Swiss-Prot record:
This is Wilms tumor protein homolog. PROSITE patterns: ZINC_FINGER_C2H2_1, ZINC_FINGER_C2H2_2. Presence of the KTS motif hinders interactions between DNA and zinc-finger 4. It holds the Pfam family zf-C2H2. A motif (KTS motif) lies at residues 198-200. InterPro entries: Wilms_tumour_N (IPR000976), Znf_C2H2_sf (IPR036236), Znf_C2H2_type (IPR013087). Its main location: nucleus. Residues 157-171, 183-191 are annotated as: Important for interaction with target DNA. GO terms for molecular function: DNA-binding transcription activator activity, RNA polymerase II-specific; DNA-binding transcription factor activity; double-stranded methylated DNA binding; hemi-methylated DNA-binding; RNA binding; RNA polymerase II cis-regulatory region sequence-specific DNA binding; sequence-specific DNA binding; transcription cis-regulatory region binding. One of its GO terms (cellular component) is cytoplasm. A motif (9aaTAD) lies at residues 43-51. It is found in: Nucleus; Cytoplasm; Nucleus speckle.
Length: 239
């Protein structure tokens, strides 16, 4: 859940959403800041202009000697432009306190964007990766094949491109040893092992806790991981 705005300008009410009230000050450490930004993006799915909210509350900060606001100034937007290493959704503004910038820069957190879907705590380095992942939960498939009589839809643009090669016959991945061509890079990698003698090689390992399965192809690992995720979701729903 979104961290409580105990150091915010005001307490959330029916007329003021929690995201608007999360105008945090320095008592929040860098870990809280990472959580706050990732949750805001995950819950709103769009850019937020909080300038109007800030205008009504920054005037009282000048006389506050105990804490300095992390975000101060008349306007800012939460969107994809990093100011802290690993954070992609806070715009660089003059009012960011230098001590907070250093604290966040020194953190070891590499994946600040966490999925808020119940039972799923997957994290991503980029907001766009989180948005792609979220479509697995929502079932959204915005990319549609425009070939005649097909109309198949996909959640990711690269999936659509890979699918369309079935229609066009394009095989852009060529083996350097025998010049055989493939429509997918992972199929080429699997084929290449027939030349190197490493046909039993399985370089893709499952990172799910207590699972040590390995696979020869990345798409096999993806299907296997999705199985874990479905089982986890079912378990959460029964609790």
């Amino acid at each position: 859940s979104v961290p409580p705005p105990v150091y915010g300008c005001h307490t959330p009410t029916d007329s003021c959403t929690g995201s608007q009230a999360l105008l945090l000050r320095t008592p929040y450490n860098s870990d809280n800041l990472y959580q706050m930004t990732s949750q805001l993006e995950c819950m709103t799915w769009n850019q937020m202009n909080l300038g109007a909210t800030l205008k009504g509350h920054t005037t009282g900060y000048e006389n506050d000697n105990h804490t300095t606001p992390i975000l101060c100034g008349a306007q800012y937007r939460i969107h994809t432009h990093g100011v802290f290493r690993g954070i992609q959704d806070v715009r660089r503004v003059p009012g960011v306190a230098p001590t907070i910038v250093r604290s966040a820069t020194e953190t070891n957190e590499k994946r600040p964007f966490m999925c808020a879907y119940p039972g799923c705590n997957k994290r991503y380095f980029k907001l766009s990766h989180l948005q792609m992942h979220s479509r697995k939960h929502t079932g959204e498939k915005p990319y549609q094949c425009d070939f005649k009589d097909c109309e198949r839809r996909f959640s990711r643009s690269d999936q659509l491109k890979r699918h369309q090669r079935r229609h066009t016959g394009v095989k852009p991945f060529q083996c350097k040893t025998c010049q055989r061509k493939f429509s997918r890079s992972d199929h080429l990698k699997t084929h290449t092992r027939t030349h190197t003698g490493k046909t039993s090689e399985k370089p893709f390992s499952c990172r799910w806790p207590s699972c040590q399965k390995k696979f020869a192809r990345s798409d096999e690992l993806v299907r296997h991981h999705n199985m874990h995720q479905r089982n986890m979701t079912k378990l959460q729903l029964t609790l």
